[in-house]
Swiss-Prot record:
Protein name: UPF0367 protein CYB_2632
Domain of life according to the entry: Bacteria
Residue numbers spanned by region Disordered: 69-89
Family the UniProt entry places it in: Belongs to the UPF0367 family.
NCBIfam families registered for this protein in UniProt: PRK13683.1
InterPro entries with a match to the protein in the record: UPF0367
Length: 89
């Protein structure tokens, strides 16, 4: 299972979307990065494979995205990987 965490401007809680396949997660991640790099707001619709829920958002409200893979081992001392761990400190 792969997790995409989308950070919104002015919102401390990320939007989390789960993808079962690595290829699907990479495609979704790359489409978000491309939309952010384009500089003009675009609309994105993502579907969570775990819950089946959909989210529709404007890239102008995004300030970051992180992709992680769910492994069998827990992260050290209960911290989350990547830049979100620093926000919680």
């Amino acid at each position: 299972m792969y997790t995409l965490e989308l950070l919104l401007k002015g919102n401390p809680a990320p939007i989390v979307v789960h993808q079962k396949e690595e290829e699907a997660a990479n495609r979704a991640y790359q489409s978000i990065v491309n939309a952010l790099q384009s500089g003009s707001p675009q609309s994105l619709e993502l579907t969570c494979d775990r819950t089946g829920k959909k989210v529709f958002l404007l890239t102008g409200e995004l300030c970051g995205v992180q992709m992680t893979s769910k492994s069998g081992s827990a992260s050290p001392m209960g911290t989350r990987p990547g830049f979100l761990a620093q926000l919680q400190s």
